[in-house]
């Protein structure tokens, strides 16, 4: 199954309340265990980040549940043609993490794709979960 990519639009026309509502749904999916962090071959950066900071499932959940509306940056269209109807939401969360015994504050780049299951429940794929590696602007800070 091949997928074609396309140029993604960038969206910043959100209100704080819209992002808060999105995060309410996102948190419910996390608490219900209906999420995954992408760790495949193309997501090496996610895997290295998780390994470098020894982030276990409990810590993943803590970080994800701690995302606030003012951590929101922007949304983009899914670049894969067959998922063109999906929007990915980008957040950047500052978190103190243990790097082999040294505590350091890290800006974590988090890209979220929330979709629905056939039964209508939200399911979340955290596409990106790694150290921020480029400048970013927050929408509400």
Q: What kind of feature is each model-predicted range?
A:
Residues 2-91:
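Compact soluble domain cores
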Residues 69-121:
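Functional cores of ribonucleases/endoribonucleases
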Residues 2-3, 94, 119, 128:
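Generic serine detector
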Residues 107-109, 113-141:
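Enriched for short, Lys/Arg-rich terminal
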Residues 37-38, 76, 106, 125-127:
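Extended aliphatic helical segments
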Residues 40, 78, 105, 138-140:
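General "foldedness" signal
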């Amino acid at each position: 199954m091949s997928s074609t990519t396309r140029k993604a639009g960038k969206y910043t026309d959100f209100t704080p309340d819209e992002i808060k509502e999105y995060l309410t749904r996102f948190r419910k999916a996390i608490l219900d265990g209906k999420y995954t962090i992408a760790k495949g071959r193309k997501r090496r950066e996610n895997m290295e980040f998780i390994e470098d900071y020894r982030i276990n499932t409990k810590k993943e959940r803590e970080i994800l549940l701690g995302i606030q509306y003012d951590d929101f940056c922007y949304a983009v269209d899914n670049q894969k043609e067959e998922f063109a109807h999906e929007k990915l939401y980008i957040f950047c969360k500052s978190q103190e993490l243990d790097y082999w015994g040294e505590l350091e504050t890290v800006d974590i780049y988090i890209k979220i794709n929330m979709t629905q299951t056939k039964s209508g429940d939200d399911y979340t794929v955290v596409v990106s979960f790694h150290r921020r590696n480029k400048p970013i602007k927050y929408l509400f800070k």
